[in-house]
Amino acid sequence: MKRFLLCSFALVLLYPAGIDMYLVGLPRIAADLNASEAQLHIAFSVYLAGMATAMLFAGKIADQSGRKPVAIVGAIVFMMASLLCSRASEGSLFLSGRFLQGVGAGGCYVVAFAILRDTLDEHRRAKVLSLLNGITCIVPVLAPVMGHLIMLRFPWQSLFYTMSTMGIIVGLLSLFILRETRPARLAPRDLSRSSPAAESLVNRFFVSRLAITTLSVSVILTFVNASPVLLMEVMGFSRGDYAITMALTAGVSMVVSFSTPFALGLFKPRTLMLVSQGLFLTAGVTLSLAHTNTVTLFGLMLICAGFSVGFGVAMSQALGPFSLRAGVASSTLGIAQVCGSSLWIWLAAILGISAMNMLIGILIGCSIVSILLIFSVAPNRSVAEHEEIPYQSRS
């Protein structure tokens, strides 16, 4: 079991590392490529577009050919794309590399969740996904710090050499440590309830959890996207203050994420999901009424706590009905989350909504819609249970 957890964590970490590690070098990258920082900020959207593109195909391929091949190819693509970014001499080539980085990270991301669905029952899966969320919260803090330390002595290209090395490590783990987890067969008693036809993506429960997780990701990505403007321009923080604040928010996320598995032993998953949305609603109201930086910071901490306590539980419930189509289900969730959050951020920018109002709007909207869905759509207890996986290969 440890090998699956290790590989799943490594596969997921490529996604946030690809977002956060290069940001500290953005001014130098822009100068060397004769582009403005504003022009290169589109690299974030390009990266997410690459992820969404990979997710369109990775899940189905993983269900048909196995998790391991997709993980290996995704890691190789991420590694090669990182090298392409490091060799870029102009903006379009750099953005092409960023798109391909997203493709590699997206494939690995989908496989990680499919592996956890294959190998864990619902109760343990919710706990592990909460821990995984806590570990990924470390990356937005450590990646910029690591990038800053690297750039003290080396050029910005070294940031992408580091990401390329991460791709190599993940590829080696996938090749030599990861075992195939795709179910080879099901017992006859499970065929009727776990056939591909029975595991339809168009059912009320899956769609409800897809909506909840998409709105939750939209909240956290809106916070990440709006945080520089909100903290440094609106609240007047320095770059150092900004870094400290983001470290504190990540710390809150880690503490809550690592505490959630213990909470699952005491409370029902639905209770934690309601607490999550209650924290989002409280954060939205707090930010809308805030007149001091202290109150605003408190509202931001509530956002991180709300996401951490509920996202893993909701993702576990969303994947629960799927054993034969875990890859497709994971892809669908990933695409919805990436595209939904990007659409909200883009629409808010087009409409000229301020950073604060953008954040307040998604917080209140997410909480109201999600609470209604949690109360109106309960888990279907007849869904397929976790299967013991007959390993197809020991390689």
Swiss-Prot record:
Main location: membrane
Membrane association type: Multi-pass membrane protein
Domain of life: Bacteria
CDD domains attached to this UniProt entry: MFS_MdfA_MDR_like (cd17320)
UniProt-annotated location(s): Cell inner membrane
Membrane-crossing segments per the record: 4-24, 42-62, 69-89, 93-113, 131-151, 158-178, 217-237, 247-267, 271-291, 295-315, 333-353, 358-378
Record-level GO cellular component terms: plasma membrane
GO molecular function: transmembrane transporter activity
Family matches, as Pfam families: MFS_1
Family: Belongs to the major facilitator superfamily. DHA1 family. MdtL (TC 2.A.1.2.22) subfamily.
Name this protein carries in UniProt: Multidrug resistance protein MdtL
